[in-house]
C-alpha cells in the first residue's frame, strides 16, 4: 500500500544565522522580534499540516556580536568562554522564535505549541584553524 500523503511525517526547516540577524540591523530587541515574527508568519502554513515541524537555526552573527561586546567590556566584566557565548545567543534566538511562533499559532487558532532545545558544541582545541582565525 502506498502512502496517500506525500508530505513526510517530519519537516525540518533550517534558518541560517544571517536570516535571524542580518547585517543591516543594529540588533535591538525590536528588530530581532520583528524578524522572528515575520519568520513565524512565513512558516505558519506548515503548522497546519499533519506533521511534526522541526526548526533549527544558526546564530553566527549573534555570537560574534556577543564576543565583540565582551572584548569592549573586558576591563569591567570577565569574558565568557566561546561555548557559553554560543549557548547564550542560541537561547536568545530560540526564545525569540518560540515567542513569535506561540503568538502566530495562537492568533491563527492553532492549538500547537513551540518547544525549544539548546544543544551543545564540541570544539577540538587542537584544530589547526585556531592558528589562523578568520
Question: Positions of the model-derived regions?
Answer:
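N-terminal glycine-/serine-/threonine-rich phosphate-binding loop
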Residues: 1-59, 65-72, 85
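Ligand-binding beta-strand-loop-alpha-helix segment within the catalytic cores
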Residues: 72-134
